[in-house]
From Swiss-Prot:
Gene Ontology CC annotation, any one: nucleus
Misc. remarks from the entry: For the sake of clarity sequence features are annotated only for the first chain, and are not repeated for each of the following chains.
Family recorded in the similarity comment: Belongs to the ubiquitin family.
InterPro entries cross-referenced by the UniProt entry: Ubiquitin-like_dom, Ubiquitin-like_domsf, Ubiquitin_CS, Ubiquitin_dom, Ubiquitin_ubiquitin-like
Maturation propeptide residues: 229
Keyword Manganese in annotation: no
PANTHER family assigned: UBIQUITIN
Positions of crosslink type Glycyl lysine isopeptide (Gly-Lys) (interchain with K-? in acceptor proteins): G76
Keyword annotations: Cytoplasm, Isopeptide bond, Nucleus, Repeat, Ubl conjugation
Organism of provenance: Euplotes eurystomus (Ciliate)
Identification of the protein by name: Polyubiquitin
Crosslink position(s): Glycyl lysine isopeptide (Lys-Gly) (interchain with G-Cter in ubiquitin): K48
Function field: Ubiquitin exists either covalently attached to another protein, or free (unanchored). When covalently bound, it is conjugated to target proteins via an isopeptide bond either as a monomer (monoubiquitin), a polymer linked via different Lys residues of the ubiquitin (polyubiquitin chains) or a linear polymer linked via the initiator Met of the ubiquitin (linear polyubiquitin chains). Polyubiquitin chains, when attached to a target protein, have different functions depending on the Lys residue of the ubiquitin that is linked: Lys-48-linked is involved in protein degradation via the proteasome.
């Protein structure tokens, strides 16, 4: 089958592959076409970095799928950033990178603005202007990411299955915004969501403040069936 590999320069390479090919094999094919050594290649599909020993089938890569090729800098290193949800992000960095640079890389991967990020290493909060070298952060070190909410608050959303979702919101957020956050976490389209608080169904254009929803309030999520009324 054919797949496509898109580089950061916007160039697209076409490769002939089998679903049983490993990621190593694919990197070798890219080397044959483009001359880029496999150890400088990082391949991304559906937001995930692909591991060398796995196959295209493992990642459900079908014909005409597009992979993204990112170059791994020589002299660079990888570090890990662990979030409070337990998710671990891998970043390619240099020891000379500042903490600001690292926060920008996290924003690129996760969409979290730098001014909402606090990074902790060895129990210390890291200051923006300092470098990784200043804090003796070596390859494969793990930083911890804590979110700094701007006047924000947390609320809970309980589903009919009994699952509770935690959301970071502002009192000025509209019900539409909240439904979009639920979609981001749970994949449920906003038009299938009905939110209930204090026995009332919440209307899209209104804000949390309109309904006097405070921090740590619990909303109830009911699904609106497709084709329903």
């Amino acid at each position: 089958m054919q797949i496509f590999v898109k580089t950061l320069t916007g160039k697209t390479i076409t490769l002939d592959v089998e679903q049983s090919d490993t990621i190593d094999n694919v990197k070798t094919k890219i080397q044959d076409k483009e001359g880029i050594p496999p150890d400088q290649q990082r391949l991304i599909f559906a937001g995930k970095q692909l591991e060398d020993g796995r196959t295209l089938a493992d990642y459900n890569i079908q014909k005409e799928s597009t992979l993204h090729l990112v170059l791994r800098l020589r002299g660079g290193m990888q570090i890990f950033v662990k979030t409070l949800t337990g998710k671990t992000i891998t970043l390619d960095v240099e020891q000379s990178d500042t903490i600001d640079n690292v926060k920008t890389k996290i924003q690129d991967k996760e969409g979290i603005p730098p001014d909402q990020q606090r990074l902790i290493f060895a129990g210390k909060q890291l200051e923006d202007g300092r470098t990784l070298a200043d804090y003796n952060i070596q390859k494969e070190s793990t930083l911890h990411l804590v979110l700094r909410l701007r006047g924000g608050m947390q609320i809970f959303v309980k589903t009919l299955t009994g699952k509770t979702i935690t959301l970071d919101v502002e009192q000025s957020d509209t019900i539409d915004n909240v439904k979009t956050k639920i979609q981001d976490k749970e994949g449920i389209p906003p038009d299938q969501q009905r939110l209930i608080f204090a026995g009332k169904q919440l209307e899209d254009g209104r804000t949390l403040a309109d309904y006097n929803i405070q921090k740590e309030s619990t909303l109830h999520l009911v699904l609106r069936l497709r084709g329903g009324f």
